[in-house]
Amino acid sequence: MTQSIKKELLFKTAEGNPVYKFRIPNNTGDYVDVTNCGASISGIYVHRPDMSMEDLAGANTLPILGGSLGKVLSDTVWSVMEEGENHVLFAQELNGADSPFGVSVKVGLRITWVNLNRLIVDIFATPAEAAAVNIEGNISIDSSGKAFGICTFCPSLTDSSGNETAVAESAYKGMAFAPLYCETPIFLNHSEEIKPMIELADDKSLLRLSVYSTFDSASCSKDEAASRVNIKAFSSGEEQLKKGQTLTHGIILGIDYIHTPAEDDGVEPTPLSCLF
């Protein structure tokens, strides 16, 4: 990294808690803006193929944490625990009365922005007592002027009745892109490792959004009124944790603009071409 995070104090709450905006750059001049108010992304600024800048987050600042924890913490000012070279780490603690799990829980959220325009989100939850815990991550994208199609790398999905069925027997078979309407099925891959889940594509802008996750479930919904596409990664069920045990999950959003054949004409191949 040759650039560093820029930190700006936006305001202080009535209780005196500081609300910051962090601008995290990478070496290509693309950057993300995040804030500790709700642990939210307020901007994803990337260069289009013509080198103009686009904000994929749009006008709204939306929390990353979803599910039952997100409902409780979406308006909370999180503590800033760490400011790294290309990441920030936020933390919050809920007492048993406020926790959706019935016990006190410590929650952490780390946002990292790296070269090649990869946004990495890590979510942590540690209960003070044994409890069944579930966490969820959300990333929201401005869809103005775009018509996204979606394909999945997952082997199965849940149908409208909640039954698990093979992707090979659905409209998404063969990694075919299907139009993104209101809401997709839930795509399932029960492998515990980080793996590709879904990909979104807009042919007009040549934009590709790839979602990798350690969660076993992913879905996508389209909000026409707000001109947004909401990507959700989550666990299909609760995970039973012991006292002090930490549940960790991660999401990677890859942002790419594909090149047309015309753009590739005249480009001399190099020994490294196979890597791109």
Would you name each region that the model predicts?
Residues T2-F276:
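An exposed, glycine/acidic-rich loop-and-rim segment of catalytic or binding clefts
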